[in-house]
């Protein structure tokens, strides 16, 4: 695939604080188009906060975020940016079927009547098939296991046909089979030229899963190709010398 030019996301001087205490501080970050990127760091480092601030879900104290064509208006780009939140942050008791949830990814592309077209339903069914959830289409989302629910949220992201995807710990709480299915999908999205940003906690799998990584602990410690920045020196800076975390295959 031909390498894309430019950046999917550009962040400058981004700071977010809770009760006057900074959670992320003076973040500068450029994410090239077409990368599969991990955001890693210790608990409380600000990984989820960074994602939410970039998406406009949290209001920063300072800083700017620009997407794709240089626009800072996330609302104008809602059809081009997809988001898969942590499964634990979702109200799974919401009365909706698997197909209903997956179809939500098409809402931004529907007309003012908001009635799904046959093509939307077909695309949704294809996405559910791809994540192995087609046979559960009529089941209530609340009746699924955590791994199955995560697959449905991935199907929703696929139906959106976005250009940039943000995923907050999509592997958390899933079994090995689901994890393999998820990473296969993420790599497929990358091959299609999409940009995928993933909050991730398993350092062991970073070299195999991702080609770009951002190390964060309040600030950005390092960001770049895995082969260049994912090494012991940067990990020590990120995890404050936590030796047990540094025994990784790099």
Show where each model-derived region lies:
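Helix-to-loop junction immediately C-terminal to a conserved catalytic motif
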Residues: 55
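Conserved ABC transporter NBD signature motif
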Residues: 63-77
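Conserved ABC ATPase "signature" region
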Residues: 103, 118-136
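Conserved ABC ATPase signature
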Residues: 140-144, 148
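Catalytic Walker B motif of ABC-type/P-loop ATPase nucleotide-binding domains
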Residues: 165-169
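H-loop/switch region of ABC-family ATPase nucleotide-binding domains
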Residues: 200-201
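H-loop (His-switch) and adjacent beta-strand-loop-beta switch element
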Residues: 212-226
């Amino acid at each position: 695939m031909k390498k894309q030019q430019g950046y999917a996301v550009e962040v400058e001087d981004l700071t977010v604080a809770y009760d006057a205490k900074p959670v992320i501080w003076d973040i500068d970050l450029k994410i090239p188009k077409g990368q599969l990127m991990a955001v890693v760091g210790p608990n409380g480092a600000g990984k989820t906060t960074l994602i939410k601030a970039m998406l406009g879900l949290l209001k920063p104290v300072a800083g700017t975020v620009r997407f794709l064509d240089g626009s800072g208006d996330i609302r104008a780009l809602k059809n081009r940016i997809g988001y898969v939140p942590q499964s634990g942050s979702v109200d799974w008791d919401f009365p909706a079927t698997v197909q209903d949830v997956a179809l939500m990814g098409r809402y931004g592309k529907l007309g003012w009547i908001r009635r799904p077209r046959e093509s939307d339903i077909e695309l949704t069914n294809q996405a559910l098939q791809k994540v192995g959830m087609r046979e559960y289409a009529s089941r209530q989302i609340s009746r699924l296991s955590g791994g199955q629910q995560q697959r449905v949220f991935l199907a929703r992201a696929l139906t959106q046909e976005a250009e940039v995807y943000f995923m907050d710990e999509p592997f958390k709480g899933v079994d090995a089979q689901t994890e393999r299915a998820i990473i296969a999908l993420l790599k497929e999205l990358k091959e299609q030229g999409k940009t995928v940003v993933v909050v991730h906690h398993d350092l062991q799998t970073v070299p195999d899963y991702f080609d770009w990584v951002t190390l964060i602990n309040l600030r950005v410690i390092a960001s770049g190709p895995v082969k260049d920045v994912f090494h012991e020196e940067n990990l020590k800076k990120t995890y404050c010398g936590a030796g047990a975390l540094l025994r990784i295959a790099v």
